[in-house]
Swiss-Prot record:
<comment type="pathway">
    <text>Carbohydrate degradation; glycolysis; D-glyceraldehyde 3-phosphate from glycerone phosphate: step 1/1.</text>
</comment>
<dbReference type="GO" id="GO:0004807">
    <property type="term" value="F:triose-phosphate isomerase activity"/>
</dbReference>
<feature type="active site" description="Electrophile">
    <location>
        <position position="100"/>
    </location>
</feature>
<protein>
    <recommendedName>
        <fullName>Triosephosphate isomerase</fullName>
        <ecNumber>5.3.1.1</ecNumber>
    </recommendedName>
</protein>
<keyword id="KW-0324">Glycolysis</keyword>
<dbReference type="GO" id="GO:0005829">
    <property type="term" value="C:cytosol"/>
</dbReference>
<dbReference type="InterPro" id="IPR020861">
    <property type="entry name" value="Triosephosphate_isomerase_AS"/>
</dbReference>
<dbReference type="GO" id="GO:0019563">
    <property type="term" value="P:glycerol catabolic process"/>
</dbReference>
<feature type="binding site">
    <location>
        <position position="178"/>
    </location>
    <ligand>
        <name>substrate</name>
    </ligand>
</feature>
<dbReference type="InterPro" id="IPR022896">
    <property type="entry name" value="TrioseP_Isoase_bac/euk"/>
</dbReference>
<feature type="binding site">
    <location>
        <begin position="239"/>
        <end position="240"/>
    </location>
    <ligand>
        <name>substrate</name>
    </ligand>
</feature>
<feature type="binding site">
    <location>
        <begin position="13"/>
        <end position="15"/>
    </location>
    <ligand>
        <name>substrate</name>
    </ligand>
</feature>
<dbReference type="GO" id="GO:0046166">
    <property type="term" value="P:glyceraldehyde-3-phosphate biosynthetic process"/>
</dbReference>
<keyword id="KW-0963">Cytoplasm</keyword>
<keyword id="KW-0413">Isomerase</keyword>
<dbReference type="InterPro" id="IPR013785">
    <property type="entry name" value="Aldolase_TIM"/>
</dbReference>
<dbReference type="Pfam" id="PF00121">
    <property type="entry name" value="TIM"/>
</dbReference>
């Protein structure tokens, strides 16, 4: 497999948290804490939809990229309550999270729908952060790698090597999200290496060497350095800890 120096990417998924004033205060604080890092780590924040436009304005010139937490696969139409990828691009989003376990578990997102969302994101000129991961029952049944492979294959269906090389994949074991439990560094590395190996089989070594794979699942300041120190862990998708500027900044610094 071709080797590549991959720039770490740390993204904060705020989920359904923070009012617009709270969101503005958080990024103002965060901006000050990560400014000294320069461009060594790519930092991304994914606030609720209502905060995207205000944050786009507030983040002008800042070393912080904006992400949305989901999108519909159609560009427009009679889809009450949905938001399209082109709309998100207009708001300054560089990334869109697709396939998050909460979307799969709570809203029934399928591998096919994740693929359609990813294609819409790409068509709108943004980069998908494609989430995959197993439940506790699947891990205990030794199905982790099979489940993750199915999800990765489904999400990448129809994409070419050059596109995939620029994507971000995120391994987030469902049993570790919001539970306080997290995969060990060795467990994370095993799955990340398997994902990279799958990308090599599906495409080629260069693509596998360039695609970035984040770990998500109870990432905190006290475990970030060990997780991010693994050779195939290229960053973190952070939930609860991203709601506190100090905690999130500490995770970002652990990625340097």
């Amino acid at each position: 497999m071709a080797t590549a120096r991959r720039r770490k990417i740390v993204a904060g998924n705020w989920k359904m948290n923070k009012s617009v004033p709270e969101a503005l205060a958080l990024v103002r604080d965060l901006r000050g804490q990560v400014a000294s890092l320069g461009d060594t780590v790519e930092v991304v924040v994914a606030p609720p939809f209502v905060a995207l436009q205000p944050l786009h304005v507030a983040l002008e010139g800042a070393p912080l990229a904006l992400a949305a937490q989901n999108c519909h696969w159609e560009s427009s139409g009679a889809f009450t309550g949905e938001i399209s990828a082109p709309m998100l691009a207009e708001l300054g989003c560089a990334y869109v999270i697709v396939g998050h376990s909460e979307r799969r578990q709570l809203f029934g997102d399928t591998d096919e729908q994740v693929n359609k969302r990813a294609k819409a994101v790409r068509a709108a000129g943004m980069t998908p952060i494609i989430c995959v991961g197993e439940t506790l029952a699947e891990r205990e049944a030794n199905q982790t790698l099979a489940v993750v492979e199915r999800q990765v294959r489904g999400a990448l269906e129809g994409f070419g090597a050059k596109e995939v090389a620029g994507f971000v994949l995120a391994y987030e074991p469902v049993w570790a999200i919001g539970t306080g439990r997290n995969a060990t560094a060795a467990q994370a590395q095993e799955v990340h290496a398997a994902i990279r190996g799958l990308v090599e089989r599906l495409y080629d070594g260069e693509t596998a060497g360039r695609v970035r794979i984040q770990y998500g699942g109870s990432v905190k300041p006290d475990n970030a350095a060990e997780l991010l120190g693994q050779p195939d862990v290229d960053g973190a998708l952070v939930g609860g800890a991203s709601l506190k500027a100090g905690d999130f900044a500490a995770i970002v610094k652990a990625a340097t």
